[in-house]
Amino acid sequence: MALPRDLSIGFSPQEIQFLIENEPTRIMPRITTRKTKKQLAKDPGAQWSLITCDDSTVNNMVAMNSCEVTLWLALLLKQQGKCNVVVPSWLTLQQLEKYLDFELKNPSRFSNLPWNWLVVSSLLFARCSDDFQDPVHLLRSKVQDLREVRLGKVNKGLQYLNESHLQLENLSLMEINEMRPYACGIMDKLRTIHDSSNDTT
């Protein structure tokens, strides 16, 4: 089945979220799934395990001992009240202010935010708001400020677009995906003009 043009040259927001939800995320479990030899000897029926493709972490969790699981599983456990999510170090008010300060002082460069910062911050704000030390409404505001400043830089950077490439470093997957259809369309037209001029010379 042929895809619409906007989907054939990029990802949908749902596809991007699906990809990012497979990224490792640190949690603080509230439950213990690891079974000791004593427990197994006392109760052979205790040899149950959670169904998962990779049980190295999920079936070896100890309450209040941090571990890494995929983001989607962290969100599921959080929804069930079985863990707290450890907020990434870059998603604090102090760190976001540093990123914003860098963006404002360097009009031609992007700060080295994680490639998934937009989606991760959105998911954690919506589903793990009680795990943040800083007020979530202030964090949302900083993230929005960062997004707007970086979007302005992207639009400015498009003026350097040519028929062969466009170099904008440290953009996130979502930011690249949003500009890709427009940039690809312009590059196709520039390439056509470039090829036509070469044919006439």
From Swiss-Prot:
Q: Where is it located?
A: Nucleus
Q: Name one Pfam family in it.
A: PSF2_N
Can you cite a GO biological process for this protein?
A: DNA replication
The record's listing under InterPro entries reads: GINS_A (IPR021151), GINS_bundle-like_dom_sf (IPR036224), GINS_Psf2 (IPR007257), PSF2_N (IPR056784)
Can you cite an annotated GO cellular component? GINS complex
> Main localization of the protein?
nucleus
Ordered alphabetically, the record's keywords are: Chromosome partition, DNA replication, Nucleus
**Which superkingdom, per the lineage?**
Eukaryota
Against CDD domains, the record matches this protein to:
GINS_A_psf2, GINS_B_Psf2
Asked if Nucleus is a keyword of the record, the answer is yes
Q: What does this protein do?
A: The GINS complex plays an essential role in the initiation of DNA replication. Has a role in chromosome segregation.
The text of the family note is: Belongs to the GINS2/PSF2 family.
Q: How does it assemble?
A: Component of the GINS complex which is a heterotetramer of SLD5, PSF1, PSF2 and PSF3.
Concerning PANTHER family, the annotation shows: DNA REPLICATION COMPLEX GINS PROTEIN PSF2 (PTHR12772:SF0)
- Its protein name is DNA replication complex GINS protein PSF2
Name the gene that codes for it: PSF2
